[in-house]
Amino acid sequence: MDAMPLSDISALGYEEARDELVRVVTELEQGSATLEESLALWERGEALARRCEEWLIGAKARLDAARAGAAESAGTAKSAVAADSRGAADSA
């Protein structure tokens, strides 16, 4: 397996890291690697799994922020409509 250095894993996107992790797991499951190769694959797999987790945590944070922003916008819009309704009732 031609793998990039562990330090380069941080440059991988989620799908790239996930796909490589699948390849690493498959290679480990085949059991044809030497002990040294297996340890290197294991370490790479751990680093790839961490990278995937970082992406998922980041994606969740972005979704949470978007939901909070949407809820805030909806709350602001409701407040504005309520204020307009009160203003119209006061002037009648």
UniProtKB/Swiss-Prot annotation:
Keywords: Cytoplasm, Exonuclease, Hydrolase, Nuclease
SUPFAM superfamilies: XseB-like
Domain of life according to the entry: Bacteria
GO BP terms: DNA catabolic process
Keyword Hydrolase: yes
Location in the cell: Cytoplasm
Region Disordered, residue ranges: 71-92
GO cellular component: cytosol; exodeoxyribonuclease VII complex
Main localization category: cytoplasm
EC id: 3.1.11.6
InterPro entries in the record: Exonuc_VII_S, Exonuc_VII_ssu_sf
Residues spanning the signal sequence: none
Described purpose of this protein according to its UniProt entry: Bidirectionally degrades single-stranded DNA into large acid-insoluble oligonucleotides, which are then degraded further into small acid-soluble oligonucleotides.
NCBIfam families to which the protein is assigned, alphabetical: PRK00977.1-3 (NF002139), xseB (TIGR01280)
Stated name of the protein: Exodeoxyribonuclease 7 small subunit
Protein's gene: xseB
